[in-house]
Swiss-Prot record:
Residues the record lists as Phosphothreonine modifications: T238
Transmembrane segments: none
CDD domains: Ubl_RB1CC1
Compartments where located: Nucleus; Cytoplasm; Cytoplasm, Cytosol; Preautophagosomal structure
GO biological process, one term: extrinsic apoptotic signaling pathway
Disulfide bonds: none
Domain writeup: The FFAT motif is involved in the interaction with MOSPD2, VAPA and VAPB and its phosphorylation regulates these interactions.
Motif (Nuclear localization signal): 566-569
Compositionally biased spans, kind Low complexity: 641-654
Record's keyword annotation contains Cell cycle: yes
Family membership: Belongs to the ATG17 family.
Protein name as it appears in the record: RB1-inducible coiled-coil protein 1
Tissue occurrence: Expression levels correlated closely with those of RB1 in cancer cell lines as well as in various normal human tissues. Abundantly expressed in human musculoskeletal and cultured osteosarcoma cells.
Length: 1594
C-alpha cells in the first residue's frame, strides 16, 4: 500500500510510504519537499469536497490518499509562473523504428529466416501496442484526476466565498446599527464629560479604600520582586490612600482640607454637537484633577485628599478616562462612512468576482474526457487486433517449421507482408492516439494554469478583504463595548452618592433591628419554655386517662419553637461610613449630586418597643401559676401518694376526672380563627380563663405540630420522657433563615417583614408558648423520675410533694395577678394590631395602583420605540435594496462591456496560442536533444559510479586493516602504560631541573646515532632501488625487442590478404594485453618499492622531529604499515624509562649526600633501577629482533618476487624458443606435404588431360575429314572464300558479344566468390577468437597459469603465422606461373590474329579467374591439399587444352573447327568452375562445423545469436564483427555485464580487445547529430545491440 498525492499542475501522481498516514500533514509536506523539491510554503493540499488539510491534523483523519481518491497537491510556484507547466513527452525506444523494421522485413526473400524475423517483429509491435495503450490510459486517468482536483479547489473556493459573504453580512448589520446609534453615542460622550467634571469635585472617602489598600500590601508581600514601573504605580496608588499608621482624620479636618483642593476646579461646559468639545472637556477635567493633586503636594497637607476621578483613573492603568474617550473618537473616525462604504462596495465586487461562472466551469471538459475514454476504448480494440495478428504469425511460424516445405513460403510471406502492413497501420493509429492524449493533457494543463492563477489571485484578494472586515468588525464591537463603559461611567456620581446614603441607612437600621430582635428573642424563649412546662405537667396527669384517645384527641401536640434564638449576623462587610461622612459629602459635592445625598429616614420603631413590653408582661403571667395549674399539681401529688400506697393501676381514675373537667374549656383540634375586634371596645375575658390554652384559643391561629413519637407512646401506654423532652426547633431555625434571606433581598416580601404587625404578634405569642412548654417539660421530667422510683423512696417523695404543693399555692396567686396585667396588655395589643392592619392595607392598595400606572406607561413607551425602530429598519432595507438594484444594473452594463473586451482578448489569445504552438515545437526539439544528452550523461555517471564503488570497496578494506592495527597498538599501549604508571612516584617535579644536563648529552648521542643510521639506510635503499630498476630495465628491453620482432612479422604478413589483417589486428591486441600486463606489473613493483621507500623516509623524518621535541631514543622502527603507531609506543616507553632512570639516580645521589637515614629507600631505588635496566635491555632486544625479522621478511619477499619474475621471464623465453622451433618444424612439414600433394595432383591432372586430349583429337580429325569432303564436293572454292570471310566477320561479332557476356558472368562469379571467401574467412576468425576468449577467461579464473596460457597462445599464433606464410608463398608462386602462362597465351593469340584466325579471349580470362580465386582459399593443412590438387588439375587441363589448340591450329585450315574447339574448352572450364565452387563451399562449411558446435553469426544478427564483439578504435566503441556494411554497436548498458569498460572511463591500453556474447535485444538507430558518441556521420543508420556474456559450459 502507498499514499497517493496527485500534483494537479502537471497531472502527475506522487507516491509515498503509508507510514505518513499516521503522521501529521506538516510531516507530509516535509516529505514532499525532500523528495520532489517543492517548498512547503508553495504547497496547498486539498481533499475531495474542497477541505484544505490542516498542518496539525493527522493525514489519516482525512478520507483521501488512495489511487482512486488521492490527495490533491497544488504548487503555487508553478501557478504564479508566467509559463504553464510543460508535460514531458515520452517516446519509447522502438515505436519510431517500426516503419523501418517493416520496410526491411518486406525486402527480405521468402525463406524460413524471413518468417521467423517477421514473427518476432509482429510480437514486438504487439508489445509496443500494449505499452502505448497503457501509457494513453495513464494520460487519460491523469486528466480525470485533474478534473477532480479542479472540482475540489472550486468547492474550496465556494466555501471561502460563503464564509466571506456571511462575514460581510454580519459586518453590514452591525455597522448599520452603529450608524443609527451614532448620535446616541455622541450624547453619551457629552454626558461623560459632565460626569467627569462632577467626579473631579466629589471627594473619595478614606474608609472606602482601606480594604483595597490592605490587599495591595498583601500582594506586595507575596511577590518577591517588582519592576520599576510597577513600584512607581504602587507608590502613586499608596499616596492616594491614607496609610494605616496615620490616625484617622476628623470630619472637621476633611472639611477644612477639601475646599483647598477644589478651589482651582472650574465647571466645564459640555457641547453635545461636537466631539472635540467633549474630548476637551474630559481632558480639562483630568488636568484640573492633576492640578488639585499638585496643590495638595505644594501645601504638604497630611490629609487624605483624593477625588473619585483619581480613583477611577488609577484602577485600570494606562486605560484612564481620557484614553477611553480618545479610543472612542479614533474608532469613530476610522469607521467614517466615507471610508467604509467604498470598502463595502469593493467587497461586493470581490464576491461577484468569486462567482465568475466562466472561470469556474470548464465548458466542454466532460465531453472531451468522454471522447478520450472512447479513444482509449478504440485503443484497446487496436491492441487486441495486434494481439490476434501476432498470434497468427506465431501459428504460421510453427506450421512452417513443422511442414519444412519451401514451396509454402512465398504465399506465407505474401500474407505476412499484408498483415504487417495492417499492423503498421494499427501502430500508426496508436501513435496518433498517443499524440492526441499528450496534446489533450498539455492543453488541459494550460487551461488549468490560467484558471488556477485566477483562483489564486481572487482568493488572495478575498483573504485580504476578509482580514480587513475582521479588523473592522472587532473595531465596531470594541467601540460598542467602550460606549457601554462610557454609559456606566456617566452614572458613577449618582451611584456613588446613592451607595453612600444606602450604607448609612443600613447602618441605622441594623442598630435598631438588633436591639428589637434581642429583646424579642429573650422574651419569646421564656414564653416558650413556660408553655412547654405546663404541657408536660398536664401530659403526665392525663397520659393514663380513659378519655385520652377517645374524646380528647390532639392533647399530645407541641407548639413550634419561635423567636427562641437570635438571628444571624448580616451586613458585616459594609464600609465604615457614618452620618458625619455623609454630611461631609453634602458640604463638598457639587449641586448636581446634592439631591442624591439626603439623610435617610427610618420607620417608627416605637410600636415594636410597646409590643416588646407587652410580651414581657405576658411572659411573667405565663410563668406564674393559675388555679388550673394548681389543681394539676395537686392531682399529681395525690397520684404519687396513691401510687406509694396502692398499685400503680389505680392512678388512672383521678386523671380521667381532671381531664374531663379540662375538656370543656379547649379543643386543640379545631382552634377558633383570629377575630379582630373593634379597638375601642375590646372583648374582656375573666381572669380565670387566662390559661395558656385559653390564650391560644382566643388570640392566636397557629399550627399545632404533633410530637414525632406520639403514636409510639399511645401503643406503649407508658410515656417516653426523652421524646417529650425533644422540641421541634428546626422549624424555628428555618423560619429564622427565611427571615434573614428575605431581609437580604432587594424587594422584601411584605408578609415576612419583621416590622409588620402580623410578624410581631406571631413572634410574641410564640415566645409565650415556648415559655409554657419549657415549664411543662420540667414538671414532666420531675414526675417521670418519681414514677420510676422504688417503693422505699415513696415516703421521701410524699414529703417533698407537700412542700411543692405549698409552693405551688403561693405561685398560683402570683400567676393570677400576672394574668390580670397580661389581659389588659393583650387588649391594647389587639387594638394596635387592628389599626396597623388597616393602615398597611390602604398603603398596599395605593402602591399597587401606582405600579400599574407606571407599568402601563413604560410598556406604551417601549412599544412606540420598537415600532419606530422597525420602521427605520424597513426603510433602511428598502433603500439598500433600491441601491443594490441600481448597482446590479450598473454591473450588468459593465459585464457586457467586459464580455466584448474578453472576446477581443480571446481572439488575441488564439493568435498568441498559435505562436506558442510553434515555440512549443521548437522547445520539444530542444527537449529531445536534452534527453539524448541526459542519456549520455547517465551512461557516464553509471560508469563513474561503478569505479567509485570499486574504490570504496578498496578503501573499506584498507580502513578495516588500519582499524585492526590501531586496536592492536592500543592494546599494547595500554599494557605498557599500565606497567609504567605503577613505577611513577611522588617526587617527579622536584627532580626535573637536575636532569637537564644529562638529557642534553644523551640527546646529542642519540642524534649522532640517528644520523649515521639514516645515512646507512638511505644508502642501502638507494642501492636496492638501483638494482631493481636495472633489472626491470633489462626485462623491459628484452620484452620490447620481442614485441618489436612480433610487430615486424605481423606488419609483413598484413599486406597479403584481408583475412590476415583481421587476425593480425587481434594478435596485436593480444600482444598489447601482454605488454599492458607486463607494464602494470612493472609499474606496481615500482610503485610498491617507491611507496615503501617514501614511507620509510617519512617515518624516519617524523621520528627525528619527535626525538627533537620529546627526547626519545627510537633508532630502528621503520615498519611499513605500523611505523607511526609503533613510534608512538616506543616514544612513550623510552621517555618514561629514561625519566625514571634519571630521577632514581638523582634521588640516590641526593639521598646519599643529604639523607643518610633513608638507606632502605635508597636500596629499593637501586633495585628498581636494576629491574628497569633489565626491562629496557629486554625490550630493546625484543625490538631489535622484531626489526631484524621484519627486514628479513621484507628482503625475502623482494627476492621471492624477483625470482618469480625472473622465472616467468625465463619461462617466456623458453616458450618463445619452443614456439619458434615448433613453427619452423611445422612449416617444413607443411611445405613437404604441399609439394607431395601438388606433384600427385599434377600427375593425375596430366593423365586425365592426356586422355581428354586424345578424345578431342579424334573428334577434331573426324570433323576435319568431314570438312574436306564438303570442300571437295563444293563447285567452286572462290565462293567458299567469300562465304568464309562473311562467316568470319559474323563469328567475330558473335564472339565479341559472347566475350562481353562471359566477362560479366566472370565478374559476378568473382564477386560471389569473394563474398563467400570473406564469409569463410570471418567464420574462421570468429572461431579463432572464441578459442582465444576461452583462453582469456581461463587466465582470469586461474591466476597461477597466466604465463603458461600466454605461452600456449603465442605458440598457436606463431604456427598459424608460419602456415599463412607458406600458403602465401605457394599461392604467389602459382600466381606467377599462371601469369607466365597468360603471357604465353596472349603471344599465341597475337600470332593467331596476325595469321587472320579468330582469337580466344576465353582462354586468357580463365587463368585470371583462377589466379584471383586461388589466394582466397583458407590456410588449414587438411583443406589446402585438396584445393591445391584441384588447382593443379585445372592448370594441367588448361595446359593440355592449349597445347591441343596450338597443334590443331597448324593442322586445321577452317574457322568452324576452331570455333568448335573453343566452345568445348569453354564448357569444360565452366563445369570445372562449378565443381570447384561446390567443393570450396562444402569444405569451408565442414571446417566451420568441425571447429565448434555453436556457430558465430557474422551477418543478420538475431536474438540468441552468438557474436564476436571487438573494440573499434575508429568509433571508440565496441562493435559486432560482421561482413555486412551496416554497423552493429554494443549498448552501453551491456558493458558491465560483459566486464568491459567504456571509452570515457578507461584508456585504450586497459580495454579488452574482444569478447564473445549473446544477443539479447536489437534496436534500429539513426545519427541525428554530427557529433555523437559513436563517431559516425550525420544520418548514418546503424543498430544498437544489447548482449550478455557467453559461457561455453552453459
Amino acid at each position: 500500500m502507498k499514499l497517493y498525492v496527485f500534483l494537479v499542475n502537471t497531472g502527475t501522481t506522487l507516491t509515498f510510504d503509508t507510514e505518513l498516514t499516521v503522521q501529521t500533514v506538516a510531516d507530509l509536506k516535509h516529505a514532499i519537499q525532500s523528495k520532489y523539491k517543492i517548498a512547503i510554503q508553495h504547497q496547498v493540499l486539498v481533499v475531495n469536497g474542497g477541505e484544505c488539510m490542516a498542518a496539525d491534523r493527522r493525514v489519516c483523519t482525512y478520507s483521501a490518499g488512495t489511487d482512486t481518491n488521492p490527495i490533491f497537491l497544488f504548487n503555487k510556484e508553478m501557478i504564479l509562473c508566467d509559463r504553464p507547466p510543460a508535460i514531458p513527452k515520452t517516446t519509447f525506444s522502438t515505436e519510431n523504428d517500426m516503419e523501418i523494421k517493416v520496410e526491411e522485413s518486406l525486402m527480405m526473400p521468402a525463406v524460413f529466416h524471413t518468417v521467423a524475423s517477421r514473427t518476432q517483429l509482429a510480437l514486438e509491435m504487439y508489445e509496443v501496442a500494449k505499452k502505448l495503450c497503457s501509457f494513453c490510459e495513464g494520460l487519460v486517468h491523469d486528466e480525470h484526476l485533474q478534473h477532480q482536483g479542479w472540482a475540489a479547489i472550486m468547492a474550496n473556493l465556494e466555501d471561502c466565498s460563503n464564509s466571506y459573504q456571511k462575514l460581510l453580512f454580519k459586518f453590514e448589520s452591525i455597522y448599520s446599527n452603529y450608524l443609527q446609534s451614532i448620535e446616541d453615542i455622541k450624547l453619551k460622550l457629552t454626558h461623560l464629560g459632565t460626569a467627569v467634571s462632577v467626579m473631579a469635585k466629589i471627594p473619595l472617602l478614606e474608609c472606602l479604600t482601606r480594604h483595597s489598600y490592605r490587599e495591595c500590601l498583601g500582594r506586595l508581600d507575596s511577590l518577591p520582586e517588582h519592576e520599576d514601573s510597577e513600584k512607581a504605580e504602587m507608590k502613586r496608588s499608596t499616596e492616594l490612600v491614607l496609610s494605616p499608621d496615620m490616625p484617622r482624620t476628623t470630619n472637621e479636618s476633611l472639611l477644612t482640607s477639601f475646599p483647598k483642593s477644589v478651589e482651582h476646579v472650574s465647571p466645564d461646559t459640555a457641547d453635545a454637537e461636537s466631539g472635540k468639545e467633549i474630548r476637551e472637556s474630559c481632558q480639562s477635567t483630568v488636568h484640573q484633577q492633576d492640578e488639585t493633586t499638585i496643590d495638595t503636594k505644594d501645601g504638604d497637607l497630611p490629609f487624605f485628599n483624593v477625588s473619585l476621578l483619581d480613583w477611577i483613573n488609577v484602577q485600570d492603568r494606562p486605560n484612564d478616562v481620557e484614553s477611553l474617550v480618545r479610543k472612542c473618537f479614533d474608532s469613530m473616525s476610522r469607521l467614517d462612512p466615507r471610508i467604509i462604504r467604498p470598502f463595502i462596495a469593493e467587497c461586493r465586487q470581490t464576491i461577484a468576482k468569486l462567482d465568475n461562472q466562466n472561470m469556474k466551469a470548464i465548458k466542454g471538459l466532460e465531453d472531451r474526457l468522454y471522447a478520450l475514454d472512447q479513444m482509449i476504448a478504440s485503443c484497446g480494440r487496436l491492441v487486441n487486433e495486434q494481439k490476434e495478428l501476432a498470434q497468427g504469425f506465431l501459428a504460421n511460424q510453427k506450421r512452417a517449421e513443422n511442414l519444412k516445405d519451401a514451396s509454402v513460403l512465398p504465399d506465407l510471406c505474401l500474407s505476412h507482408a499484408n498483415q504487417l502492413m495492417i499492423m503498421l497501420q494499427n501502430h500508426r493509429k496508436l501513435l496518433d492516439i498517443k499524440q492526441k492524449c499528450t496534446t489533450a493533457k498539455q492543453e488541459l494543463a494550460n487551461n488549468l494554469h490560467v484558471r488556477l492563477k485566477w483562483c489564486c489571485f481572487v482568493m488572495l484578494h478575498a483573504d485580504q478583504d476578509g482580514e480587513k472586515l475582521q479588523a473592522l468588525l472587532r473595531l465596531v464591537i470594541e467601540l460598542l463595548e467602550r460606549v457601554k463603559i462610557v454609559e456606566a461611567l456617566s452614572t458613577v456620581p449618582q451611584m456613588y452618592c446613592l451607595a453612600v446614603v444606602e450604607v448609612v441607612r443600613r447602618k441605622m437600621f441594623i442598630k435598631h433591628y438588633r436591639e428589637w430582635a434581642g429583646a424579642l428573642v429573650k422574651d419569646g424563649k421564656r414564653l416558650y419554655e413556660a408553655e412547654k412546662s405546663k404541657r408536660e405537667s398536664f401530659g403526665k396527669l392525663f397520659r393514663k386517662s380513659f378519655l385520652r384517645n377517645r374524646l380528647f384527641r390532639g392533647l399530645d401536640s407541641w407548639p413550634p419553637s419561635f423567636c427562641t434564638q437570635k438571628p444571624r449576623k448580616f451586613d458585616c462587610e459594609l464600609p465604615d461610613i457614618s452620618l458625619k461622612d455623609l454630611q461631609f459629602l453634602q458640604s463638598f459635592c457639587p449641586s448636581e449630586v446634592q439631591p442624591f445625598l439626603r439623610v435617610p429616614l427610618l420607620c417608627d420603631f416605637e410600636p415594636l418597643h410597646q409590643h416588646v413590653l407587652a410580651l414581657h408582661n405576658l411572659v411573667k403571667a405565663a410563668q406564674s401559676l393559675d388555679e388550673m395549674s394548681q389543681t394539676i399539681t395537686d392531682l399529681l401529688s395525690e397520684q404519687k401518694a396513691s401510687v406509694s400506697q396502692t398499685s400503680p393501676q389505680s392512678a388512672s381514675s383521678p386523671r380521667m376526672e381532671s381531664t374531663a373537667g379540662i375538656t370543656t374549656t379547649t379543643s386543640p383540634r379545631t382552634p377558633p380563627p383570629l377575630t379582630v375586634q373593634d379597638p375601642l371596645c375590646p372583648a374582656v375575658c375573666p381572669l380565670e380563663e387566662l390559661s395558656p390554652d385559653s390564650i391560644d384559643a382566643h388570640t392566636f391561629d397557629f399550627e399545632t405540630i404533633p410530637h414525632p413519637n406520639i403514636e409510639q407512646t399511645i401503643h406503649q401506654v407508658s410515656l417516653d420522657l426523652d421524646s417529650l423532652a425533644e422540641s421541634p426547633e428546626s422549624d424555628f431555625m428555618s423560619a429564622v433563615n427565611e427571615f434573614v434571606i428575605e431581609e437580604n433581598l432587594s424587594s422584601p416580601n411584605p408578609i415576612s417583614d419583621p416590622q409588620s404587625p402580623e410578624m410581631m404578634v406571631e413572634s410574641l405569642y410564640s415566645s409565650v408558648i415556648n415559655a409554657i412548654d419549657s415549664r411543662r417539660m420540667q414538671d414532666t421530667n420531675v414526675c417521670g423520675k418519681e414514677d420510676f422510683g422504688d417503693h422505699t423512696s415513696l415516703n421521701v417523695q410524699l414529703e417533698r410533694c407537700r412542700v411543692v404543693a405549698q409552693d405551688s399555692h403561693f405561685s398560683i396567686q402570683t400567676i393570677k395577678e400576672d394574668l390580670c396585667h397580661f389581659r389588659t396588655f393583650v387588649q391594647k395589643e389587639q387594638c394596635d394590631f387592628s389599626n396597623s392592619l388597616k393602615c398597611t392595607a390602604v398603603e398596599i392598595r395605593n402602591i399597587i395602583e401606582k405600579v400599574k400606572c407606571s407599568l402601563e406607561i413604560t410598556l406604551k413607551e417601549k412599544h412606540q420605540k420598537e415600532l419606530l425602530s422597525l420602521k427605520n429598519e424597513y426603510e433602511g432595507k428598502l433603500d439598500g435594496l433600491i441601491k443594490e438594484t441600481e448597482e446590479n444594473e450598473n454591473k450588468i452594463k459593465k459585464l457586457k462591456g467586459e464580455l466584448v473586451c474578453l472576446e477581443e482578448v480571446l481572439q488575441n489569445k488564439d493568435n498568441e496560442f498559435a505562436l506558442v504552438k510553434h515555440e512549443k515545437e521548437a522547445v520539444i526539439c530542444l527537449q529531445n536533444e536534452k534527453d539524448q544528452k541526459l542519456l549520455e550523461m547517465e551512461n557516464i555517471m553509471h560508469s563513474q559510479n561503478c569505479e567509485i564503488k570499486e574504490l570504496k570497496q578498496s578503501r573499506e578494506i584498507v580502513l578495516e586493516d588500519l582499524k585492526k592495527l590501531h586496536v592492536e597498538n592500543d592494546e599494547k599501549l595500554q599494557l605498557l602504560r599500565a606497567e609504567l604508571q605503577s613505577l611513577e612516584q611522588s617526587h617527579l617535579k622536584e627532580l626535573e631541573d637536575t636532569l637537564q644536563v644529562r638529557h642534553i648529552q644523551e640527546f646529542e648521542k642519540v642524534m649522532t646515532d640517528h644520523r649515521v643510521s639514516l645515512e646507512e639506510l638511505k644508502k642501502e635503499n638507494q642501492q636496492i632501488i638501483n638494482q631493481i630498476q636495472e633489472s626491470h630495465a633489462e626485462i623491459i628491453q628484452e620484452k620490447e625487442k620481442q614485441l618489436q620482432e612480433l610487430k615486424l612479422k605481423v606488419s609483413d604478413l598484413s599486406d597479403t590478404r584481408c583475412k590476415l589483417e583481421v587476425e593480425l589486428a587481434l594478435k596485436e591486441a593480444e600482444t598489447d594485453e601482454i605488454k599492458i600486463l607486463l607494464e602494470e606489473s612493472r609499474a606496481q613493483q615500482k610503485e610498491t618499492l617507491k611507496s615503501l621507500l617514501e614511507q620509510e623516509t617519512e617515518n624516519l623524518r617524523t621520528e627525528i622531529s619527535k626525538l627533537n621535541q620529546k627526547i626519545q631514543d627510537n633508532n630502528e622502527n621503520y615498519q611499513v604499515g605500523l611505523a607511526e603507531l609503533r613510534t608512538l609506543m616506543t616514544i612513550e616507553k623510552d621517555q618514561c624509562i629514561s625519566e625514571l632512570i634519571s630521577r632514581h639516580e638523582e634521588e640516590s645521589n641526593i639521598l646519599k649526600a643529604e639523607l643518610n637515614k633513608v638507606t632502605s629507600l635508597h636500596n629499593q631505588a637501586f633495585e628498581i633501577e636494576k629491574n628497569l635496566k633489565e626491562q629496557i635491555i629486554e625490550l630493546q632486544s625484543k625490538l631489535d629482533s622484531e626489526l631484524s625479522a621484519l627486514e628479513r621478511q621484507k628482503d625475502e619477499k623482494i627476492t621471492q618476487q624477483e625470482e618469480k619474475y625472473e622465472a616467468i621471464i625465463q619461462n617466456l623465453e623458453k616458450d618463445r624458443q619452443k614456439l619458434v622451433s615448433s613453427q619452423e618444424q611445422d612449416r617444413e612439414q607443411l611445405i613437404q606435404k604441399l609439394n607431395c600433394e601438388k606433384d600427385e595432383a599434377i600427375q593425375t591432372a596430366l593423365k586425365e588431360f592426356k586422355l581428354e586430349r586424345e578424345v578431342v583429337e579424334k573428334e577434331l580429325l573426324e570433323k576435319v575429314k568431314h570438312l574436306e569432303n564438303q570442300i571437295a564436293k563444293s563447285p567452286a572454292i572462290d565462293s567458299t572464300r567469300g562465304d568464309s570471310s562473311s562467316l568470319v566477320a559474323e563469328l567475330q561479332e558473335k564472339l565479341q558479344e559472347e566475350k562481353a557476356k562471359f566477362l560479366e558472368q566472370l565478374e559476378e562469379q568473382e564477386k560471389r566468390k569473394n563474398e563467400e571467401m570473406q564469409n569463410v574467412r570471418t567464420s574462421l576468425i570468429a572461431e579463432q577468437q572464441t578459442n582465444f576468449n576461452t583462453v582469456l577467461t581461463r587466465e582470469k579464473m586461474r591466476k597461477e597459469n597466466i604465463i603458461n596460457d600466454l605461452s600456449d597462445k603465442l605458440k598457436s599464433t606463431m604456427q598459424q603465422q608460419e602456415r599463412d606464410k607458406d600458403l602465401i608463398e605457394s599461392l604467389s608462386e602459382d600466381r606467377a606461373r599462371l601469369l607466365e602462362e597468360k603471357k604465353k597465351l596472349e603471344e599465341e593469340v597475337s600470332k593467331l590474329r596476325s595469321s587472320s584466325f579468330v582469337p580466344s579471349p576465353y582462354v586468357a580470362t580463365a587463368p585470371e579467374l583462377y589466379g584471383a580465386c586461388a589466394p582466397e582459399l583458407p590456410g588449414e593443412s587438411d583443406r589446402s591439399a585438396v584445393e591445391t590438387a584441384d588447382e593443379g588439375r585445372v592448370d594441367s587441363a588448361m595446359e593440355t587444352s592449349m597445347m591441343s589448340v596450338q597443334e590443331n591450329i597448324h593442322m586445321l585450315s577452317e574457322e568452324k573447327q576452331r570455333i568448335m574447339l573453343l566452345e568445348r574448352t569453354l564448357q569444360l572450364k565452366e563445369e570445372e568452375n562449378k565443381r570447384l565452387n561446390q567443393r570450396l563451399m562444402s569444405q569451408s562449411m565442414s571446417s566451420v562445423s568441425s571447429r565448434h558446435s555453436e556457430k558465430i553469426a557474422i551477418r543478420d544478427f538475431q536474438v540468441g545469436d552468438l557474436v564476436l564483439i571487438i573494440l573499434d578504435e575508429r568509433h571508440d566503441n565496441y562493435v559486432l564483427f560482421t561482413v555486412s556494411p551496416t554497423l552493429y554497436f554494443l549498448h552501453s548498458e551491456s558493458l558491465p555485464a560483459l566486464d568491459l569498460k567504456p571509452g570515457e572511463g578507461a584508456s585504450g591500453a586497459s580495454r579488452r580487445p574482444w569478447v564473445l556474447g549473446k544477443v539479447m535485444e536489437k534496436e534500429y538507430c539513426q545519427a541525428k547529430k554530427a557529433q555523437n558518441r559513436f563517431k559516425v556521420p550525420l544520418g548514418t543508420k546503424f543498430y544498437r545491440v544489447k548482449a550478455v556474456s557467453w559461457n561455453k559450459k552453459v
